[in-house]
């Protein structure tokens, strides 16, 4: 049975889920979303059945301190604290979008925790101009335009074919969220502006697989290529998918597991 637990550090709650599977640890650091990914932990279990044959999955929600100017350093400190409290000695790290950014920082701040790393739809260098989509979402969340934000989020993240096939899910999804969640969402987005750790990761020596999409409207193909070049690691670029290819591409989980087993 899946578990959801909380670790407290200072004024922040670090929420995480455990999806029991194999003996090895697989830490999932998700991308941004208006509501908690842990609301969908049962769906994650279904989607990642192939991974669960060999790994137990630990899904971390992003710790949410209430201060308006919190940073990536704080997010990393909370994550390291939680991993050590849980007692995970070494894990495969799987980071999506902002979760990939956090994973990359972890790779040079606490490399001993990481056995292998999969970086998905992410970036090691950003600026406000490069993140026009996120800037729009920040403005929507600041205005508490929950329905508009959710609709734009869904239609930006996924291909038009996926959206049309899942219209019923979209109609259920667009009303989810609260004013407080909008404020947290906006704070997380702001941490992603003017981010640059390309030089920091050049000396990282952890087996890494970077996966991106040529049609990613948030980071673009180039961001994945920059990470792979800095790390000197394996790279795969999907064609025909948007940012959330990790939910759409039918071979995605198999591709990850095959890489993990070959490294």
Residue ranges and their predicted role:
Residues 217-223:
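Conserved alpha/beta-hydrolase "acid-adjacent" motif
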Residues 241-253:
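Catalytic histidine-centered segment of alpha/beta-hydrolase-like enzymes
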């Amino acid at each position: 049975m899946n578990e959801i637990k909380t670790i407290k550090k200072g004024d922040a709650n670090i929420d995480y889920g455990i999806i029991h599977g194999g003996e090895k640890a697989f830490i999932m650091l998700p991308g941004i979303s208006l509501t908690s990914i842990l609301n969908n932990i049962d769906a994650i279990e279904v989607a990642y059945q192939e991974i669960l044959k060999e790994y137990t999955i630990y899904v971390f929600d992003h710790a949410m301190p209430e201060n308006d100017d919190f940073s990536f350093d704080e997010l990393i400190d909370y994550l390291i604290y939680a991993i050590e409290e849980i007692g995970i000695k070494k894990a495969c790290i799987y980071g999506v979008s902002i979760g990939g950014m956090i994973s990359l920082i972890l790779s040079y701040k606490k490399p001993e925790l990481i056995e292998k790393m999969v970086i998905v739809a992410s970036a090691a260098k950003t600026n406000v101009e490069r993140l026009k989509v996120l800037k729009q979402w920040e403005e929507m969340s600041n205005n508490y335009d929950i329905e508009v934000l959710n609709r734009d989020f869904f239609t930006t993240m996924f291909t038009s074919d996926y959206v049309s096939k899942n219209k019923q899910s979209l109609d259920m999804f667009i009303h989810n969220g609260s004013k407080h969640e909008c404020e947290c969402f906006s704070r997380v987005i702001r941490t992603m502006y003017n981010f640059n750790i390309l030089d920091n990761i050049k000396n990282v020596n952890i087996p890494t697989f970077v996966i991106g999409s040529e049609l990613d409207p948030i980071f673009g193909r180039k961001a994945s290529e920059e990470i792979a070049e800095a790390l000197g690691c394996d790279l795969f670029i999907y064609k025909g998918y948007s940012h959330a290819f990790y939910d759409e591409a039918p071979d995605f989980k198999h591709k990850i597991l095959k890489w993990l087993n070959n490294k």
